[in-house]
């Protein structure tokens, strides 16, 4: 299954790139593929957010790259256009600093999002969209903006999930401990353990990043996401899509292939015994022999006498007698069962003819078993 895990992680990475590019449908398709290959918690968390909030992605106004070929250092904004000295200068305003300080001072998730404890899904989405755009590190360069952005994502992730929200309401203020232990990552099923990054959550809501075309750095526990350019070759993705059908068929056929291989190996490893209790012309076991102890008849091929002598012959004859006694014992049990059934039927139906027939059964195997038993006892 580890091979499937690697393929699933590749699918998750492709899904993340699709989210950065604003292609939610492609992201959802590759996350579903990852789910089939291996149950990664990160894939499940991303897929749940897309299914729950996918319809809102890209609907809120925020910065986008201009479609033309002009100056790409100036974002085409429809909201929050007054941002101090602008992104190109990496400056920030006093309002941005005050906002970051205000978020980082909040003691619980409800304060972070600025909602009441009975806030519904729409209230949470509205609050998250507003704050995520305002504090995204590609837009807000004030000191502490990254931590504030993580805090906002963590708050929405917990409060938007009914189970997490219920747990959070019961345990009280654990937000600070979560941030210290997991550096801002969050999980929908296992406490504060991370499975989805704030950037992934943002991309699910807004269908892509800011005009810088970069992924801001979030170092968090098991994974670190560095600043990197998003111009990627799509050849591998197309190859993944084309190869999906063949790989799925291979996975489905794997159990059958394994069974066939095991069957072939077992046949190769198990050799035929050098004797038979009955003559078998197909294997050449037609030469009649008799065991020294019980006088059991068995059949061998023409090379047997040359290959089995002394101790080897004694072992073979012991196996012959054990097989013979086992067969006689089983056949005797069948004879007794048949006789008992006939006697019972004769009694129920008052059938004298059937009773006489039951009494007349020869019981040859049982007689042979008695003979063998007397020999064993030295009689």
From Swiss-Prot:
- Renumbered residue ranges of the record's region Disordered: 55-94, 221-241
Q: What Gene3D superfamilies is this protein classified in?
A: DnaJ domain
Topological domain, Lumenal: which ranges? 266-379
Transmembrane domains' residue ranges: 245-265
Compartments it resides in: Endoplasmic reticulum membrane; Nucleus membrane
The record ties this protein, via SUPFAM superfamilies, to: Chaperone J-domain
CDD domains to which the protein is assigned, alphabetical = DnaJ
Q: Which domain of life is it from?
A: Eukaryota
Residue ranges, Cytoplasmic side:
1-244
GO biological process terms, semicolon-separated = cellular response to misfolded protein; chaperone cofactor-dependent protein refolding; protein-containing complex assembly
| Name this polypeptide is given | DnaJ homolog subfamily B member 14
The organism encoding this protein is: Bos taurus (Bovine)
The UniProt gene name for this protein comes to DNAJB14
């Amino acid at each position: 299954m580890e091979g499937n895990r690697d393929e699933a992680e590749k699918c998750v990475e492709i899904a993340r790139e699709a989210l950065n590019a604003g292609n939610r449908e492609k992201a959802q398709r590759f996350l579903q593929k990852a789910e089939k290959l291996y149950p990664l918690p990160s894939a499940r968390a991303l897929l749940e957010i897309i299914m729950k909030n996918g319809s809102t992605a890209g609907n809120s106004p925020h910065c986008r790259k201009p479609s033309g070929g002009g100056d790409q250092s100036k974002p085409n904004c429809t909201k929050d256009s007054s941002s101090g000295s602008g992104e190109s200068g990496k400056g920030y305003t006093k309002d941005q600093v005050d906002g970051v300080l205000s978020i980082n001072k909040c003691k619980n998730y409800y304060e972070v999002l600025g909602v009441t404890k009975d806030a519904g899904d729409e209230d949470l989405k509205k609050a998250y969209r507003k704050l995520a755009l305002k504090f995204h590190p590609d837009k807000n360069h004030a000191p502490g903006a990254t931590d504030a952005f993580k805090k906002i994502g963590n708050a929405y992730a917990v409060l938007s999930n009914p189970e997490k929200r219920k747990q959070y309401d019961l345990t009280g203020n654990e937000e600070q401990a979560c941030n210290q232990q997991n550096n801002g990552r969050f999980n929908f099923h296992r406490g504060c353990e991370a499975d989805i990054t704030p950037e992934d959550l943002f991309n699910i809501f807004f269908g892509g990043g800011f005009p810088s075309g970069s992924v801001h750095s979030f170092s968090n526990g098991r994974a670190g996401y560095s600043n990197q350019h998003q111009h990627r070759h799509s050849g591998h993705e197309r190859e993944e899509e084309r190869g999906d059908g063949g790989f799925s068929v291979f996975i489905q056929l794997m159990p059958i292939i394994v069974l066939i291989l095991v069957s072939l190996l077992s046949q190769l490893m198990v050799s035929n015994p050098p004797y038979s209790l009955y003559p078998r012309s197909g294997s050449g076991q037609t030469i009649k022999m008799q065991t020294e102890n019980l006088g059991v008849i068995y059949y061998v091929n023409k090379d047997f006498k040359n290959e089995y002598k002394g101790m080897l012959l004694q072992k073979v004859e012991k196996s012959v007698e054990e097989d013979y006694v086992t067969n006689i014992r089983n056949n005797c049990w069948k004879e007794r069962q048949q006789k008992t059934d006939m006697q019972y039927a004769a009694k129920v139906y008052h059938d004298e003819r059937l009773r006489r027939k039951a009494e007349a059964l020869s019981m040859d195997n049982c007689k042979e078993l008695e003979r063998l038993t007397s020999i064993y006892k030295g009689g």
